[in-house]
């Protein structure tokens, strides 16, 4: 029976560490600030943003929310981002995705100052990650590495398979595993003999967006299984990309959904905001 990796507990520990560090900085008159820009009225995005705000405030940071209507022009959104780039009290900027169709996400991400790009999506940060230079790492991949390490697993020398090749999770998590000296395979919808490829993994990261896609025939006995999915099953119950009940017997360690990767994402956002603030203060 696999051991369950408690993402909530780990997220809480990291957040407490961030909060302590912020408290020390506040004593020196320095307060990290995070601005979130929300366009339109997508309920899922709104809930997620509210959660981010709450956690930012709990950590003792300044939290700013800028809400814009669904029909806002791209020009107006870009000018809001430019203003935040110039704002000395804001150290992290996050534009909540997805954006309405008439706005180019790429253009918006490119406009965020890479020093304040706490999501780690700016091309400069992506490039720095791939050449091994210090950068802001996307929050979910950063959280995944922390979850793997929390099991006591030595990543170096292990076979890791990442199923999914998105720019937000798949590619960056593969790069982070490579930096940790794992031997990495990226698998995707065109991969032949996928169960067989997955079964070679000591560490398996699944980010397919398909409910309960991975079954126990994908799992090497004792593997660390990280489920990035957030789906609904046929009964409308929250589940992941891994069929948890089927896989839990084979896995050595496994993240649950909910309560695995999810809680880590916001925590790593706070860690990135703290890092951004410290960097900006150091430069000035």
From Swiss-Prot:
Keyword match Protein biosynthesis: no
Any one GO biological process: methionine biosynthetic process
Keywords recorded for this protein, A-Z: Amino-acid biosynthesis, Histidine biosynthesis, Hydrolase, Methionine biosynthesis, Multifunctional enzyme, NADP, One-carbon metabolism, Oxidoreductase, Purine biosynthesis
Domain of life: Bacteria
CDD domains per record: NAD_bind_m-THF_DH_Cyclohyd
Pathway in which the depicted protein is active: One-carbon metabolism; tetrahydrofolate interconversion
Binding positions (NADP(+)): 164-166, 189
Keyword Mitochondrion annotated: no
Transmembrane regions: none
One Gene Ontology cellular component annotation held by this UniProt entry: cytosol
GO molecular function: methenyltetrahydrofolate cyclohydrolase activity; methylenetetrahydrofolate dehydrogenase (NADP+) activity
E.C. numbers: 1.5.1.5, 3.5.4.9
Catalytic reactions of this protein: (6R)-5,10-methylene-5,6,7,8-tetrahydrofolate + NADP(+) = (6R)-5,10-methenyltetrahydrofolate + NADPH; (6R)-5,10-methenyltetrahydrofolate + H2O = (6R)-10-formyltetrahydrofolate + H(+)
InterPro entries in the record: Aminoacid_DH-like_N_sf (IPR046346), NAD(P)-bd_dom_sf (IPR036291), THF_DH/CycHdrlase (IPR000672), THF_DH/CycHdrlase_cat_dom (IPR020630), THF_DH/CycHdrlase_CS (IPR020867), THF_DH/CycHdrlase_NAD-bd_dom (IPR020631)
Subunit structure and binding partners: Homodimer.
UniProt-listed NCBIfam families: PRK10792.1, PRK14170.1, PRK14186.1, PRK14188.1
Role noted for this protein: Catalyzes the oxidation of 5,10-methylenetetrahydrofolate to 5,10-methenyltetrahydrofolate and then the hydrolysis of 5,10-methenyltetrahydrofolate to 10-formyltetrahydrofolate.
Family: Belongs to the tetrahydrofolate dehydrogenase/cyclohydrolase family.
Name the record gives this protein: Bifunctional protein FolD
């Amino acid at each position: 029976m696999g051991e369950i990796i408690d993402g909530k507990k780990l997220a809480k520990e990291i957040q407490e560490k961030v909060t302590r560090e912020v408290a020390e900085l506040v004593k020196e008159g320095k307060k990290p600030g995070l601005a979130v820009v929300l366009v339109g009225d997508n309920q899922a995005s709104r809930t997620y943003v509210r959660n981010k705000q709450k956690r930012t405030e709990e950590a003792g940071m300044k939290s700013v929310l800028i809400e814009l209507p669904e029909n806002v022009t791209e020009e107006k959104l870009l000018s809001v981002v430019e203003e935040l780039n110039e704002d000395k009290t804001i150290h992290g900027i996050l534009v909540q995705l997805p954006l309405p169709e008439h706005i180019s996400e790429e253009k918006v991400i490119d406009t965020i100052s890479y020093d304040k790009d706490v999501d780690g999506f700016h091309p400069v940060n992506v490039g720095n990650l791939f050449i091994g230079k210090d950068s802001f790492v996307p929050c979910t991949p950063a959280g995944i590495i922390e979850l793997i390490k929390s099991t006591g697993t030595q990543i170096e020398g292990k076979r890791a398979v990442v199923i999914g090749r998105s720019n937000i999770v798949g590619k960056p998590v593969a790069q982070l595993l490579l930096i940790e000296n794992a031997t990495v395979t990226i698998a995707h919808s065109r991969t032949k003999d996928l169960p067989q490829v997955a079964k070679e993994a000591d560490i398996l990261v699944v980010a397919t967006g398909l409910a309960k896609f991975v079954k126990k025939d994908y799992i090497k006995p004792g593997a660390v299984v990280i489920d990035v999915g957030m789906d609904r099953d046929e009964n409308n119950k929250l589940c992941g990309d891994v069929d948890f009940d089927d896989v839990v017997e084979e896995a050595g360690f496994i993240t649950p959904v909910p309560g695995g990767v999810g809680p880590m994402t916001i925590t790593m956002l706070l860690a990135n905001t703290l890092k951004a603030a410290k960097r900006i203060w150091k430069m000035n």
